[in-house]
Amino acid sequence: MVCRELRNLLLAAALALAAPWAVAGPASSDEAVLGAYDGYREGDALKLARYAKRLEGHVLTPWLDYWRIAMRLEDTPTPEVRAFLDQHANTYVAELLRGDWLKVLGKHADWEEFERQLPLYPRDDLEVHCYAALMEAQRGEETSPADTAWMWLDPHELPDGCASLAQFMLDQERVTVTDVWRRVRVLFRNGQITAAKTTLGYLEKEDSPDERLLADAARQPKRVLDRLPRNLERRAVREVVVLAFLRYARADPEAAAKLLESHLAARLPESDVHYLWAYVAYEGAREHQPDALKWYARAAHEALDEDELAWKVRAALRAGNWRVVRDTIDLMPPMQRHESAWTYWYGRALAAQGEETGSRAYYLRIAGQTDFYGLLASEELGYVEAPPQSTYVPTEAEVDAARQNAGLQRALELIRLGLRTEGVKEWLFSVRYFDDAKLLAASELARRAEVWDRSIQAADRTVRTHNFALRYPLPFRDVFTEYAKTYNLDVAWVLGLVRQESRFISDARSNAGAAGLMQVMPRTARFVARKIGLRNYMHKGVTEIQTNVTLGTGYLRLVLDQLGHQVLASAAYNAGPSRARRWRDATRPLEGAIYTETIPFSETRDYVKKVMANSVFYAALVQKQMTPLKARLGVIAPRGTAEPAEPADPLPEDELP
């Protein structure tokens, strides 16, 4: 019943979105595609075949063929799979099926065919990598957890192929007790308790921890730490205490640091003490604890992983300690050190220490890039950007060539039919090797189809030749302008936020329930509707464009009134007003860029960077002026500063997109 209702909804959406450019037949063919898709999802081969019979020559024939063979791949003869791969060579569905087949081949140890297909599969797939390593190990290659750290230290439950590799290494006595506990620590740090218990199953009984003590470490870590076992010289007992500390430090880093300093450090080996100081400092930095740098100082540099190094830099930024910023970035591995964020902050650290020539050299590495730190670096060099000019407009011949591209046809058709996940993957595959001109032609094709997210994605990828009108489109411009004026909001900021929220997909829905152009949550929508006097509001209409923009801009106005700053309001729109307030410093004003870089949630940190950078370009396109990003970021006042009182009717916090 659910699948039938889903099919009907998808069909209705497809008919509503039908456009003259689309490669689509009559409604009956739309119904047949969705019916075939239902058959595939339900595992009903007869149903799939019945609908597929009506679709001979359809643009989505490769997908119909894929659905048919994928349903029975375990039992499909090798010649038939090879025939599919040859028939659909250089398509997304061929790559998809080859990945599926490699896992089947690995599962059945058909290494001859696996080795034949592996070079033809370019994707970075963890399970396929594991089967490749298992093949080599079974042929006598020396394979250990150190050789397969990319798998062994993955912070999730291992897929079947990786579990098989781990078991083989265990059977060959290539896994040590230290290897097992190293993986368990990674899993505990990431809350993967079930996977940690699975990994502990690799240990011999005499090396295994007490199950009750392990359960307490996961659920009641303070209890374990308050009643330290006497026999800490035993590895299994000591490791469980370390695990308990990891859980406790995540919840309360300040209390954990006091406990470590007062008595726990004296009971543990020096290497474990350094490891725990590094972790408690990391968690303290994420909570903006003022003592985080002191805790970092008690950990050996060698004990810090990439995340811990990044948060040491962030803690130093909040403390204004430019020497530690510079020294810590110097400790980063080369790939991390060359990321645009650390390139910019290294330049700032050099400037703060009077090394202006050196700082300019670092800014020049990323200046001209159109992202958050590229803009800031350009501004540090004194480059005041003029409103961006599109350097390339695709010709009609180029757009027509994009229209004839079979992969793009399939992508847009899948999206039109409501099969967005499949359509997006088809699109990404199709444009992956496009040069700038082809990317912009594909972007223009998607723009004409009003598939705004794909248009933006293609235009965003250009390297030398750009089209900012495609990269920063203005659908529904009049609606956004009207409501930005109604609520006295900067329309460039609103557009920058919507570009990040939904990519202008009017019927977008998140897994959390956020809906529409401005990704309004259900409870937030009801709250704002009541606040602004939107009468007879029904949530089923939340994706209607006028309604959604009314609610979204109304909420943005309420948040801005409470927090008084676009950076704070942007963070609040993504993660809630209370968090945005809490992330300010307790006593010191912070640069807006430092506040943004030190947001604890990586999703929100990235979100605010993109919203604020987007706003710069939308101001240029809509208002014909470039307000520097640094000016938009401004300064964030400390928590103790006088601000508007929190209303008696606080904004919703419990349903975040």
Predicted regions and their residues:
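Generic helix N-cap/helix-start motif at coil->alpha-helix transitions
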Residues: 24-32, 43-44, 56-63, 75-76, ...
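Inward-facing hydrophobic residues that define packing positions of alpha-helical scaffold repeats
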Residues: 48-52, 81-85, 98, 114-118, ...
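Structural motif corresponding to the intra-repeat A-B loop/turn of tetratricopeptide repeats
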Residues: 42, 71, 75, 104, ...
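Alpha-helical adaptor scaffolds
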Residues: 68-70, 85-86, 98-103, 273-288, ...
